[in-house]
UniProtKB/Swiss-Prot annotation:
The gene is grrA. One of its GO terms (cellular component) is cytoplasm. It comes from Emericella nidulans (strain FGSC A4 / ATCC 38163 / CBS 112.46 / NRRL 194 / M139). Specifically expressed in ascus mother cells. Residues 11-25 have a biased composition (Low complexity). Keywords: Cytoplasm, Leucine-rich repeat, Meiosis, Repeat, Sporulation, Ubl conjugation pathway. This is SCF E3 ubiquitin ligase complex F-box protein grrA.
Length: 585
């Protein structure tokens, strides 16, 4: 669709660029899109507007203040430090020069977080006699806060905005090819497009993207189930600057499209193929071999993938940039593939092998080679893993912050006692590890003796269906972990009491009655309320104990010391036991 131009208006052709943060009081919806949540290499360009009449000159006899001689780049940088749109508006009204250098900051990312705002912005964009050409000032447009309201008709005024760099339409399900195509046509500056969950979109829109958006760096079409290889191949051939590609749930995509991206888009840093169940080993091998800068590869539920995807990699290959690999539910992945992955990607930070049911201790021993690089590891439902492997993993990778061992039914207190030595552990998942007891929880709760770690770093602990746990361990955990914001105890009998479940969050609406009866998850303020309640309950008992204590405190201390010594001696008899005091950071 042809774009109309009114040359009498102010234009926003930018003589310079600034990468500084330029949007005061950003709305909540501004940072929700897939690309802006990450360190996107593409920064929105903010420039000065051009005057209506470029021949207007200042009176040569007029004495101007020094600030009038600053170049636009410096003025824009100064104005970008202002914290509110009201302050920017005040500056805009000072003089023509300030107006030209403020207006872009006000308009580059308009707040469309409610319907009234959106209507006002749309009206201003379509106004024929406005002082500025606002359509050319908008660089980021995010309509994801109005998912139920936005339709093809809503976006018609924005079809004039041909300098948009980031367009976010997440979950705007009423949009069709008509509305999205109108926004895309002529958008030569578009760098990031998020149309996730627009299930009515077809190849038509993606062909328009391929024709118009050769600067595109980020594309998120999660859930666009009607998109096929045909349009994706066109995108790969015309948008060769792509860095981030999210095809989560695009069920018709096959190796044909993925191989085309591997061949034509060498700058890809992140690719998500979750639930792309037609993708096979050939695609994975090609991506890992060809994309030297690849940082994230997500293959969750790509069930056709097996060991060959990694064993067929060239022996010399070293993917030193790869940081995240997600193989959730790739059930045919075995130990040999994990060994090859670790040797080829020695700097992996996040490794997800949840539901890779055939891996054993051998795979975990291979993961140990990642050492201090490993921060996040998910081994849920890997039921062949034993204590010895987990203990060695902790010894080798002491910077782990997140570990999930849900349904690893062979693990005992020995594993958790070793996990308790991790100085930076924030989240631990032990759901259905039914052999663990209060000894594990007391180990996690034990105060750190290392002065560099003043208190536990634990924030989320998942203990549902750990049926041997009692109030003693959990109470100690609550009091020792001030940062705790999530505690799941579903199915733990000691906590299915009405006076405690009142602090739980509501069960999800889709749960059955039986699931609701055992649901027990504390989060946010609920954790604090549970802690306070248990402490109040314990206070009378503590007072009673203090009233019957021996007068001879030295004798009592001596008895306690003997008991403590026996307990420590018993623990040390275990050859694989390590003192649970966290090591020095």
């Amino acid at each position: 669709m042809a774009r109309s131009r009114q040359p009498t208006r102010f234009s926003s052709e930018a003589p310079s660029e600034s990468s500084s943060s330029t949007s005061p009081e950003r709305a909540a919806d501004d940072d929700t899109d897939f690309f802006t949540l990450q360190a996107n290499d593409s920064q929105s360009s903010i420039g000065a507007g051009n005057p209506r009449d470029s021949h207007i000159q200042n009176d040569p006899e007029t004495v101007l203040p020094p600030i009038a001689y600053l170049p636009p780049e410096i003025l824009i940088s100064i104005f970008s430090k202002l914290s509110s749109p009201r302050d920017l508006l005040s500056c805009l009204l000072v003089c023509r020069i300030w107006a030209l250098n403020c207006v872009g900051l006000l308009w580059h990312r308009p707040s469309c977080n409610n319907w009234d705002n959106l209507k006002k912005i749309a009206a201003a964009v379509g106004e024929e006699d406005s002082f500025f050409l606002y359509s050319s000032l908008i660089k980021r447009l995010n309509l994801s806060a109005l998912t139920e309201d936005v339709s093809d008709g809503t976006v018609v005024p924005f079809s004039q905005c041909n300098r948009i760099e980031r367009l976010t339409l997440t979950n705007c399900r009423k949009l069709t090819d008509i509305g999205v195509s109108d926004l895309v046509v002529g958008s030569r500056h578009l760098q990031a497009l998020d149309v996730s969950e627009l299930r009515s979109l077809t190849d038509h829109t993606l062909f328009k993207v391929a024709e118009n958006c050769n600067r595109l760096q980020g594309l998120n079409i999660t859930g666009c189930v009607k998109v096929t290889d045909d349009s994706l191949i066109a995108v790969s051939q015309n948008c060769r600057l792509l860095k981030r590609l999210k095809l989560n749930g695009v069920s018709q995509v096959t190796d044909k499209a993925i191989l085309s991206f591997a061949q034509n888009c060498p700058s890809i840093l992140e690719i998500d193929l979750q639930e792309c169940k037609l993708v096979t080993n050939q695609s994975v091998t090609a991506l890992m071999t060809t994309l030297q800068n690849l940082r994230e590869l997500r293959l969750a539920h790509c069930t056709e993938i097996d060991d060959s995807a990694f064993l067929d990699l060239p022996r010399h290959i070293q993917m030193t940039s790869l940081r995240i690999l997600d193989l959730t539910a790739c059930e045919n992945i075995r130990d040999e593939a994990v060994e090859r992955i670790v040797s080829s990607a020695p700097r992996l930070r996040n490794l997800v092998l949840a539901k890779c049911k055939f891996i054993t201790d051998r795979a975990v021993w291979a993961i140990c080679k990642l050492g201090k690089n490993l921060h996040y590891v998910h081994l849920g439902h890997c039921s062949n893993i034993n204590d010895s492997a987990v203990i060695q993993l902790v010894k080798s990778c002491n910077r782990i912050r997140y570990i999930d061992l849900a349904c690893c039914s062979r693990l005992t207190d020995r594993s958790v006692q070793q996990l308790a030595t991790l100085p930076k552990l924030r989240r631990i998942g032990l759901v259905k590890c039914q052999l663990i007891t209060d000894a594990s929880i007391l180990a996690l709760a034990r105060p750190a003796q290392d002065h560099s770690v003043p208190c536990s770093s634990l924030e989320r602990v998942h203990l549902s269906y750990c049926v041997n746990l009692t109030m003693v361990g959990i109470h100690a955990l609550l009091n020792s972990c001030p940062r705790l914001t999530h505690l799941s105890l579903t199915g733990v009998a000691a906590f299915l009491r009405e006076e405690l479940t009142v602090f739980c969050r509501e069960a999800p609406p889709e749960f059955t009655r039986q699931q609701r009866e055992v649901f027990c998850v504390f989060s946010g303020e609920g954790v604090n309320r549970l802690r306070n309640h248990l402490n109040r309950e314990a206070a009378p008992q503590r007072d009673a104990n203090e009233a019957t204590m021996y007068d001879d405190e030295e004798e009592l201390d001596e008895d306690e010391g003997q008991v403590t010594g026996l307990m420590h001696a018993a623990a040390i008899n275990d050859d694989d036991y390590i003192n649970i005091t966290p090591p020095h950071a």
